[in-house]
């Protein structure tokens, strides 16, 4: 067998084994050294391949796809800095427990550490952020094919295990790289036996089930029975089924629920926006929780952590579906690794309903509405609120970091009885790759997605706009343009004008309308809340991607946030004094 033949077979069995493991979505960036892998993936009848000129965009797209599906996409790139461009998304995938599979092509052994062109130290490049990193040898008939299949199967099981995360396979190839016609009857494959005639993977790993132990459920039920004022917190939850189970638990036990925007429950009609209530120190003091059940991961807002430090609950119990530590405020007294859905359902069957629950705060909703009248200019606050009210229940929502995710968490209104798939990159909370992540999320959901994003995040990933023309589902991109880093206006450094604007405000003065034109994307810039509502309704009903720009001034936005929040606090304080 000649070199071209073994290289072709080598690449084919890698792709074939991934497909047999139901890993069929490939994000490919053009490159020479990765030619064997690219051709194998492109020619396979059961793969879906999307091409990305930019590796960073490819990796964030794969991240968004994983958030939507719970399954990894496969990243294929050439040698050199290509694999390094995946790094930010790999970090987010690792911190956010999202599966991802990187196949980086590399120069062969004899070219490494020699000064050869486009050759870097790729093996292990992601360090501790990779769940597993492995070097595959150059294609050779001396290597049994079952060794390759076994490595692929282990890579798949590792990236999808608990905790899920990125896995990196670095694969060296010698020239020539061009494939030859595939020979599935090659003698090299004869040792595989039944694999050749079946469609099953070479080996399977049966994942450990994270069903709750009855002792854990009984212990939490016992503590719950003795609690006078328990509280449920829904933190970051990826799966709607988990979110629904937590909501059902809150309802069946009549326990107040704090639903973070990352929980998928914040927009649900049966939740109460405790984010707004907790602006008031009096409200927090008068609603002290002595037991807190925290389901899922981290929270967007700071108020729960501050409340925990004030309350010092007798018991703070975290239930999460992974073994990683979660104790940002060091108040956790018990941590349980189990399926969130299974634990919530078991606890609902074991426990008795509580006697009281936090009252709805409808007056607070009315106060926010007063600041978001239809004839008023559209603001950062009203944009988030209007999106939360008008988003199609059959669509998805992706939120950029910095102010968009915070405004949606604080000021959103309840939209209906359907759980709207909601995603954000809160593992490491970077502002990079947001458009790509939202595009991947939409692709995985196979439904339209609304993206709420700031101007700096938009600029950071603007090259991803070229991906959207080939999308089968559209994005509605709402860009909050306050000409800089608006969140820094809320920090103490904003009081030092000699350094603030240049180093933190960072005005960019770029033209979003021109960017939309350059990428042939529909664009609107509505001036009022009524006009924005009309524009958003039209965009969400369109089959094409569109950009809606919301222009804002950072100083006015800061003043509005302070004025509205103080108005909410005053009303809440009056309620608590009655």
UniProtKB/Swiss-Prot annotation:
To which protein family does this belong? Belongs to the TPP enzyme family. MenD subfamily.
Q: What does this protein do?
A: Catalyzes the thiamine diphosphate-dependent decarboxylation of 2-oxoglutarate and the subsequent addition of the resulting succinic semialdehyde-thiamine pyrophosphate anion to isochorismate to yield 2-succinyl-5-enolpyruvyl-6-hydroxy-3-cyclohexene-1-carboxylate (SEPHCHC).
Q: Which PANTHER family match?
A: 2-SUCCINYL-5-ENOLPYRUVYL-6-HYDROXY-3-CYCLOHEXENE-1-CARBOXYLATE SYNTHASE, PROTEIN PHYLLO, CHLOROPLASTIC
Highest rank taxon of the organism: Bacteria
Origin organism is Prosthecochloris aestuarii (strain DSM 271 / SK 413)
Task: Tell me the pathway.
Answer: Quinol/quinone metabolism; 1,4-dihydroxy-2-naphthoate biosynthesis; 1,4-dihydroxy-2-naphthoate from chorismate: step 2/7; Quinol/quinone metabolism; menaquinone biosynthesis
Listed InterPro entries: DHS-like_NAD/FAD-binding_dom, MenaQ_synth_MenD, MenD_middle, THDP-binding, Thiamin_PyroP_enz_TPP-bd_dom, TPP_enzyme_TPP-bd
Under the subunit heading, UniProt states: Homodimer.
Has the keyword Methyltransferase been applied to this entry?
no
Q: What name does the UniProt record give this protein?
A: 2-succinyl-5-enolpyruvyl-6-hydroxy-3-cyclohexene-1-carboxylate synthase
Q: Which NCBIfam families match?
A: menD
Annotated cofactor note: Binds 1 thiamine pyrophosphate per subunit.
For this protein, the parts annotated as crossing the membrane are none
- What's the catalysed reaction? isochorismate + 2-oxoglutarate + H(+) = 5-enolpyruvoyl-6-hydroxy-2-succinyl-cyclohex-3-ene-1-carboxylate + CO2
According to its UniProt entry, the protein's GO biological process terms are: menaquinone biosynthetic process
What terms describe the molecular function in GO for this protein?
2-succinyl-5-enolpyruvyl-6-hydroxy-3-cyclohexene-1-carboxylic-acid synthase activity; magnesium ion binding; manganese ion binding; thiamine pyrophosphate binding
The answer to keyword Magnesium applying to this record is yes
User: EC?
Assistant: 2.2.1.9
Which cofactors are named for this entry? Answer: Mg(2+); Mn(2+); thiamine diphosphate
The UniProt keywords, alphabetically, are: Magnesium, Manganese, Menaquinone biosynthesis, Metal-binding, Thiamine pyrophosphate, Transferase
């Amino acid at each position: 067998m000649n070199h071209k033949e073994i290289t072709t077979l080598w690449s084919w069995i890698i792709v074939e084994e991934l497909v047999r493991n139901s890993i069929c979505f490939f994000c490919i960036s053009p490159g020479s050294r990765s030619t064997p892998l690219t051709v194998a993936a492109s020619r396979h009848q059961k793969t879906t391949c999307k091409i990305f000129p930019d590796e960073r965009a490819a990796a964030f797209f794969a991240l968004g796809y994983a958030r939507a599906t719970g399954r990894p996409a496969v990243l294929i790139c050439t040698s050199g800095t290509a694999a390094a461009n995946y790094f930010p998304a790999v970090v987010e995938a690792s911190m956010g427990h999202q599966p991802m599979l990187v196949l980086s092509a590399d120069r062969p052994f004899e070219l490494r550490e020699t000064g050869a062109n486009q050759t870097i130290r790729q093996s292990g490049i992601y360090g501790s952020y990779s769940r597993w990193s492995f070097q595959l040898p150059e294609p050779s008939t001396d290597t049994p094919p079952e060794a390759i299949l076994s490595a692929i199967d282990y890579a798949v099981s590792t990236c999808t295990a608990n905790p899920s995360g990125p896995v990196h396979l670095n694969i060296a190839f010698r020239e020539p790289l061009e494939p030859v016609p595939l020979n599935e009857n090659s003698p090299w494959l004869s040792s595989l036996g039944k694999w050749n005639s079946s469609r099953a993977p070479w080996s399977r790993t049966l994942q450990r089930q994270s069903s709750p132990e009855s002792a854990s459920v009984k212990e939490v039920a016992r503590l719950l029975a003795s609690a006078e004022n328990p509280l449920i917190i829904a933190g970051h939850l990826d799966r709607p089924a988990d979110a629904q189970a937590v909501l059902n638990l809150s309802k069946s036990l009549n326990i107040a629920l704090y639903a973070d925007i990352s929980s998928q429950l914040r927009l649900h009609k049966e939740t109460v926006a405790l984010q707004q209530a907790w602006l008031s120190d009096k409200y927090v003091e008068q609603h002290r929780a002595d037991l807190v059940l925290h389901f899922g991961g981290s929270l967007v807002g700071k108020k729960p952590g501050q409340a925990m430090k004030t309350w010092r609950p007798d018991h703070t119990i975290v239930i999460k579906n992974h073994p990683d530590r979660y104790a940002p405020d060091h108040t956790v007294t018990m941590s349980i690794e189990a399926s969130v859905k299974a634990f919530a359902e078991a606890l609902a069957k074991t426990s008795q309903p509580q006697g009281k629950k936090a009252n709805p705060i409808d007056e607070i909703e009315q106060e926010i509405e007063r600041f978001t009248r239809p004839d008023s200019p559209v603001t950062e606050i009203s944009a988030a609120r209007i999106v939360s009210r008008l988003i199609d229940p059959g669509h998805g929502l992706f939120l950029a970091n910095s102010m968009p995710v915070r405004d949606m968490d604080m000021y959103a209104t309840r939209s209906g009885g359907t759980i709207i798939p909601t995603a954000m990159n809160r593992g490491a909370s970077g502002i990079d790759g947001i458009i790509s992540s939202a595009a991947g999320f939409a692709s995985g959901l196979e439904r339209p997605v609304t993206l709420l994003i700031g101007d700096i995040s938009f600029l950071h990933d603007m090259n991803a706009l070229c991906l959207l023309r080939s999308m089968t589902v559209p994005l509605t991109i709402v860009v909050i343009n306050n000409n800089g880093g608006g969140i820094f206006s809320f920090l103490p450094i904003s009081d030092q004008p000699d350094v603030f604007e240049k180093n933190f405000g960072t005005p960019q003065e770029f033209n979003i309308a021109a960017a939309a034109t350059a990428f042939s994307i529909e664009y609107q810039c509505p001036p009022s809340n009524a006009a924005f509502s009309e524009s958003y309704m039209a965009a969400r009903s369109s089959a094409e991607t569109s950009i809606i720009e919301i222009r804002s001034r950072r100083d006015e936005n800061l003043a509005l946030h302070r004025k509205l929040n103080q108005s909410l606090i005053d009303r809440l304080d009056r309620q608590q004094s009655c």
